[in-house]
Structures are given as structure tokens and as C-alpha cells.
């Protein structure tokens, strides 16, 4: 019998990061370093969950190009199932290009995610059996609104669906499907936008009124506020003196929520597990911590999370 698995549906792309070696000169070629890595919110969430011991299948799309091959190879190398990642003619593999100054601060960026529009209900219907047999489904707000609705209507009654808001620009796509979602994970700015509230507590209460069932709000160094219809609670991390890279905190948090759910963890244990994963991640220079594992998270919880 196949082990219960997670299905992630959403963005997968290559991240191309350039960092100047000195002060950036506009309209000129600047000497520096260029780093290529795998990215995309849903793909990153899925890789985190794999590193935490979960079986995960990714549903996404890449172009029939060299970047698509690189991305698929890198996904497979970490154990992520890509059988339902479609290679599409006429599309470019999604890419995110950022330029940073010598201090690491971003100067500018361009994202090319047009391929996400190709993830239509008709295309995803080819993965019906994979979706129906999943223990839990994760989606991100990179998906077109009609695809989000189709997924939620088709599978939300029988399968728990976890949703990542991605950004303030894309988070509103989730409002019409809130009642179908098991869990929504916004950061505080996204929660304020969706709810009209100010504090995490007020935002979560308002989202419950709008139909949400479980709300997990990441509030930066304060930690995470979790609320459902039975209870609400905070999980606070110990203060950190050094943050190496906060970029991957949200993706590891969501990966932890999913891996914990798939493993049958009770809600409070699941949230503490996820927050510990997030704390460990921001102590690494990499967006996805390379040595992240279920055992490392379990061993580190008491050092990372306040009682």
C-alpha cells in the first residue's frame, strides 16, 4: 500500500540571482556573481516537506526548454515526484531574475510566470487520480482564479486543502474559495489585506467569519498565530541574534504544516513543528536549508520555541 502523500499544485521556476561586487553602475555591465537555484512558492513548499520526510508529488508546468530540464532534474534530485509536471510547447519555464547590491539588498527584479496561466482545469484534470488519492493538497495563489475554484470545488469536500497566499497582489484570489480550504497561511500584511483587521487575532477572527476553518498567520519575529473554531494560540520563537536569510521562512513553515498533517500530528504539535522548521531555515543562507530534516526539527524544538 502506498504511503500517504501530499500533492502540491502551483508555481515552479528558476531563480537567477545576480549580486554586484561593488557599487552598481546603471546602464552598464557590472562585475559580480550569478547564482541559479530552484524556486517557485509551491515547489519550495514541496521540497521542504520532502526534506521533512513526506512523500510529495508536484503538479506544475515547465517549458520545453533547457531551463525546464534543469528544474526537473533538480526536483528529482531531492526526491520530489515530477510525473505530473507538464512540459509545454510554446511557453517559457517560469523564471525570477533579481539584481542585488554588494550588501545583498535587492535593487530590482523581474518575474516571468506567464506559464502559470496554462495550468487550466482541463490540463489538471489529467492528474485526477493523483489528486483523488492524495492525503492532503497544497495550492498557492500563483494559480489562475478559475483553476483554484475548480480544484476546491472538485476536491475540497473530500480532501484537506492548504493554501499559501504568495503575496498581497495574489492573496485576494483565495477569498472566493475560503470555505473550501482546510488551512490558509498568510503573513500579517496579507492577513490584514484579506480581513480588514489589524492584529493577528483580529485578522484570524475576521477570516473565520468569511468562511476559513484554520488560519495560520506568520508575524515575523513574534512567531505564528493559529486560530480555528475551537481555539486560538501563539507559538513564539526565541529571539534570534542573527538571521542569515529570511526569504524561505514562509515556505518552510507551510512545508512543516503539511508534513506534520500528513504524519498525523495534533494541531499544536504540528504548528510547533512548522515554526521550528521556519526558525531553522532563517539561520541558513539558503532559501531551503540543505540539512533540514524531520529529526533535526524534532531535536531543535526546545532550543527554537518558547515553552
Language model regions located:
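Conserved phosphate-binding/catalytic region of the ribokinase-like
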Residues: 1-7, 30, 200-307
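A glycine-rich helix N-cap at a beta->alpha junction
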Residues: 77-90
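Conserved phosphate/ATP/ADP-binding segment of small-molecule kinases
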Residues: 156-234
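Gly/Ala-rich phosphate-binding loop of Rossmann-like dinucleotide-binding domains
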Residues: 50, 156, 262
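Conserved phosphate-binding/catalytic loop of the ribokinase/pfkB sugar-kinase fold
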Residues: 87-88, 98-136, 141
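Glycine-rich phosphate/adenosyl-contacting loop at the front of the ribokinase-like
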Residues: 1-80, 236, 243
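Short beta-strand scaffold segments in enzyme catalytic cores
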Residues: 95-99, 108, 223-227
